[in-house]
């Protein structure tokens, strides 16, 4: 029996021997394809090769591609754990031909692998072909020797693949494995085809046509091959299993969750272990590829997956975060094939632990509310969709968790009502937004773009230029001219002014004509390539068609260039120090400062920030040229350029490289390489200096770094130096000795605070004359009772005071009430261990709380705490406890 890792290796080795380039799995976040949330098939990374937009140095390839299907139309989330073959994460084995071999060789390679290399019984295999594909039908007979009844013609779209409404397409041929007549189900195309007897293990797509229009289809000049075989499915067949969750990989993960929870994967607990095993895989791989839990987009899908697993961990009785404890088992199983798991293990572990800790309160609250709302429902009933939406909207409880929690009771959810409630909320939000004219104005820019074309940007090479005024916009309408004092927007045929984008704010400066002068206060990009200059007419007037001289504020642009280049250096330094999971989540490049948001699950240490800053300044000191090049996005990514994956890039992109790497894989190579349309310094030395001034959280899994460069950084350091000198003078020490003096003062303060606390405790235990129950312990029904109203003791110190009281009694009950400055009271009751079977501290403290005007109280039988608003009744509270003790 072959293990999953061996099956994967055999597949890749087989195709390597047969002349295929073995290509590594692409990330789960598709590169340069905003139409996909996640990579969901092996052909995704070759999409542009198939369409002819990209050339590769090989014509045949094979991959083991990691895939996720948990969003959009490919959403298996609800079924995962409850069926034999649904997964959120899976591996797709595939071989590809880009105009090289076609049907005959593809069928031959597939048949030889599964029958000769994997050793599957040919008698258990049958295939399907598209109903008009006589060529494939004949080839299966010729190569595999299959009889006509084991080559099934299918007329549906199941056996015809298309990339979209237009583009490459072609017939498919699927290979099925027969698990035997002891399992219900019929062959594909039969009335019983939805049964589990015949399972598809491999799909061969023959791309031989191009769809031109809905009615027109032509032959491709170079037909291609795209195949996909689910690793988990073929492993189940090879290991003699009918259920994917019974293969060796899943057995190892489930064994880890059994050990961690102490609950066997049996009966109604079986599905929970399966959910956890599957969701651990998708969560870990998504985090390794730079996705972090959030409330939108890919991050929200990840959060839903993680929270569903965490809910099933709770069903298994886990009271502490569980998934991070299972991570070593996953890394042990898959880390060799996917080294990114090993590289990101610390990040994955930290993210899993943090998310589960945060979610526990939401889960508990949501489950309680769900239980209340569904108490009167029976099997077959529908849970109210509006209530489900309230759980989601108000309490952060996702719909799929509601569905999953109710599934065990046989209760469905009215998803139509849920969707209607969500749409209604969105409509109300739109109606409540009064707006300020921006939406109406936006249409003008598209109209001007269509009329005049895109603005030519000259600002990479110059900060001054000549142009022609094409349009003047005032108050949302196009006008012919503008006079002194008017605020307008100008569109010109070309400009050196940078329009705000990529985090860099727009340029300011001056525009002059023969008849007037304008101050440019901002520049924005509008209407797909239109640069809009926001201006005030300072002198004379201006009109459409006039020639104009445009001059950018040079000093301000210089600061912007330095700050933008510094963000690139900081980005790379952060990735070096924290890990390759760090990705840009937002930025602000302003003239006076820079701000950079990155994906990272926890606060950075002072040491990490120090190293990041030192690395960036190291590159600045090199004073090497900053190089910009234009190239295709695929060439840029092949060179290691960082991009905002998922963004749509044009055929040509601008790549900015700076610095010389000094260590590791960067040694001898450019330090930072990014796709960027912003303006940058000519050499790294022009940045002058970078100083990180703060690091903070802006959301779950996102940290913000703020920094200064050049003169602003030097001014900041000067101010800090002055503060240290002022502090040193106040402390009467040299600046170098400030830290030591402050530490000594803090130690002295802590010592005095401890002494003060101990003195207060002794005073309280000795009696301070403020209680109405006497200073000494009393005997109540054979139990020694010490009750006091204490002053000057913080509520947080009452418990330790009560512990001291118990020790002084040896055996008995202690009750203390402290009153704060605002008149509120805190009460604590402690019972020695020998009496807890007779007397409960929880019961007694509730009596005290009631006397103080409070409600409840809680704790353990030996120690409980409560409070109340009426500190004036503190002595009564002590006597109330004494009375309750007397019975």
UniProtKB/Swiss-Prot annotation:
CDD domains given in the database record: AlaRS_core
Domain notes: Consists of three domains; the N-terminal catalytic domain, the editing domain and the C-terminal C-Ala domain. The editing domain removes incorrectly charged amino acids, while the C-Ala domain, along with tRNA(Ala), serves as a bridge to cooperatively bring together the editing and aminoacylation centers thus stimulating deacylation of misacylated tRNAs.
Family matches, as SUPFAM superfamilies: Class II aaRS and biotin synthetases, Putative anticodon-binding domain of alanyl-tRNA synthetase (AlaRS), ThrRS/AlaRS common domain, Translation proteins
KW Zinc (keyword) present: yes
E.C. numbers: 6.1.1.7
Assigned GO CC terms: cytosol
Main function: Catalyzes the attachment of alanine to tRNA(Ala) in a two-step reaction: alanine is first activated by ATP to form Ala-AMP and then transferred to the acceptor end of tRNA(Ala). Also edits incorrectly charged Ser-tRNA(Ala) and Gly-tRNA(Ala) via its editing domain.
EC primary class: ligase
PROSITE patterns attached to this UniProt entry: AA_TRNA_LIGASE_II_ALA
The protein's name in its UniProt record: Alanine--tRNA ligase
Keyword Lipid metabolism: no
Source species of the chain: Rhizobium meliloti (strain 1021) (Ensifer meliloti)
Gene Ontology annotations of biological process type: alanyl-tRNA aminoacylation; negative regulation of DNA-templated transcription
Protein location: Cytoplasm
Listed GO MF terms: alanine-tRNA ligase activity; aminoacyl-tRNA deacylase activity; ATP binding; tRNA binding; zinc ion binding
Predominant cellular place of this UniProt entry's protein: cytoplasm
Cofactor(s) essential for the protein: Zn(2+)
Family recorded in the similarity comment: Belongs to the class-II aminoacyl-tRNA synthetase family.
């Amino acid at each position: 029996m072959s293990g999953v890792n061996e099956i994967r290796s055999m597949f890749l080795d087989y195709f390597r021997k047969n002349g295929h380039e073995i290509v590594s799995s692409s990330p789960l976040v598709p590169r340069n394809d905003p139409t996909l949330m996640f990579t969901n098939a092996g052909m995704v990374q070759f999409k542009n090769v198939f369409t002819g937009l990209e050339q590769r140095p090989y014509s045949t390839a094979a991959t083991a591609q990691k895939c996720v299907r948990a969003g959009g139309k490919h959403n298996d989330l609800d079924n995962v754990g409850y069926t034999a073959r649904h997964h959120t994460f899976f591996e797709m084995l595939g071989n590809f031909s880009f105009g090289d071999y076609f049907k005959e060789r593809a069928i031959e390679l597939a048949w030889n692998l599964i029958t000769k290399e994997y050793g599957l019984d040919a008698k258990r295999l049958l295939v399907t072909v598209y109903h008009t594909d006589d060529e494939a039908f004949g080839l299966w007979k010729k190569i595999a020797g299959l009889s006509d009844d084991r080559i099934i013609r299918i007329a549906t779209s199941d056996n015809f693949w298309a990339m979209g409404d237009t583009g490459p397409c072609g017939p498919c041929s699927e290979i099925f494995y027969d698990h035997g007549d002891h399992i219900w189900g019929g062959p594909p195309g039969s009335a019983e085809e939805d049964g589990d007897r015949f399972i598809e293990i491999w799909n061969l797509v023959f791309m031989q046509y191009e769809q031109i229009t809905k009615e027109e289809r032509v032959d491709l000049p170079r037909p291609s091959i795209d195949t996909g075989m689910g690793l988990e499915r073929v492993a189940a067949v090879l290991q003699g299993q009918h259920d994917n969750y019974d293969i060796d990989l899943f057995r190892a993960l489930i064994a880890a969750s059994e050990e961690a929870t102490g609950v066997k994967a049996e009966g109604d607990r079986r599905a929970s272990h399966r959910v956890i095993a599957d969701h651990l895989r998708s969560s870990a791989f998504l985090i390794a590829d730079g996705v972090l839990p959030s409330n939108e987009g890919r991050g929200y899908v990840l959060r839903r997956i993680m929270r569903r697993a965490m809910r099933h961990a709770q069903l298994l009785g886990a009271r502490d975060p569980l998934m991070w404890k299972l991570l070593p088992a996953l890394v042990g199983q898959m880390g060799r094939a996917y080294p990114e798991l090993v590289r990101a293990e610390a990040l994955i572990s930290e993210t899993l632990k943090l998310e589960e800790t945060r979610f526990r309160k939401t889960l508990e609250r949501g489950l309680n509310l769900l239980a209340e709302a569904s108490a009167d429902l029976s099997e077959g009933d529908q849970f109210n969709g509006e209530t489900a939406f309230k759980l989601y909207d108000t309490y952060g409880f996702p719909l799929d968790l509601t569905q999953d929690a109710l599934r065990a009771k046989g209760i469905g959810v009215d998803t139509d009502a849920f969707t209607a409630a969500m749409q209604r909320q969105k409509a109300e939000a739109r109606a409540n937004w009064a707006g300020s004219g921006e939406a109406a104005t936006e249409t003008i820019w598209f109209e001007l773009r269509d009329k005049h074309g895109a603005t030519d940007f000259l600002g990479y090479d110059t900060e001054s230029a000549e142009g022609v005024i094409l349009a003047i916009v005032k108050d949302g309408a196009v006008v012919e001219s503008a006079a002194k004092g008017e605020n307008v927007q100008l569109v010109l045929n070309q400009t050196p002014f940078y329009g705000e984008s990529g985090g860099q704010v727009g340029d300011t400066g001056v525009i002059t004509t023969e008849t007037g002068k304008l101050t440019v206060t901002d520049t924005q990009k509008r209407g797909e390539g239109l640069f809009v200059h926001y201006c005030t007419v300072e002198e004379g007037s201006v009109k459409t068609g006039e020639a104009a001289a445009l001059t950018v504020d040079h000093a301000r642009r210089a600061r912007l260039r330095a700050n933008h280049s510094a963000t690139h250096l900081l980005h790379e330094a952060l990735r070096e120090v924290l890990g390759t999971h760090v990705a840009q989540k937002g930025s602000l490049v302003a003239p006076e400062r820079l701000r950079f948001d990155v994906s990272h699950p926890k606060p950075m240490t002072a040491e990490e920030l120090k190293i990041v800053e030192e690395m960036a300044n190291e590159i600045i000191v090199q004073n090497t040229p900053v190089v910009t090049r234009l190239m295709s996005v695929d060439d840029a990514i092949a060179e290691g350029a960082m991009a905002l994956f998922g963004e749509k890039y044009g055929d040509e992109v601008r790549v900015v490289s700076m610095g010389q790497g000094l260590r590791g894989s960067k040694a001898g190579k450019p330090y930072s390489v990014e796709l960027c349309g912003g303006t940058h310094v000519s050499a790294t030395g022009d940045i002058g200096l970078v100083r990180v001034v703060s690091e903070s959280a802006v959301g779950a899994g996102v940290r913000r770094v703020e920094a200064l460069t050049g003169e602003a950084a030097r001014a900041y350091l000067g101010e800090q130096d002055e503060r240290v000198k002022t502090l040193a003078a106040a402390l009467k020490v040299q600046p170098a000795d400030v830290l030591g003096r402050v530490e000594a003062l803090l130690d002295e303060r802590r010592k005095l605070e401890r002494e003060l606390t101990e003195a207060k405790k002794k005073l309280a235990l000795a009696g301070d004359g403020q209680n109405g129950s006497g200073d000494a312990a009393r005997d109540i029904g054979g139990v020694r009772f010490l009750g006091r109203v204490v002053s000057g003791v913080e509520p947080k110190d009452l418990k330790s005071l009560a512990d001291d009281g118990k020790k002084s009694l040896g055996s008995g009950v202690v009750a203390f009430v402290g009153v704060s400055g605002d008149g509120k009271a805190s009460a604590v009751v402690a019972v020695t261990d020998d009496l807890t079977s007779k007397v409960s501290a929880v019961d007694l403290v509730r009596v005290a709380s009631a006397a103080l005007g409070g409600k409840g109280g809680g704790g353990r039988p030996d120690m409980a705490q409560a409070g109340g608003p009426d500190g004036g009744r503190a002595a009564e509270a002590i006597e109330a406890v004494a009375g309750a003790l007397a019975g």
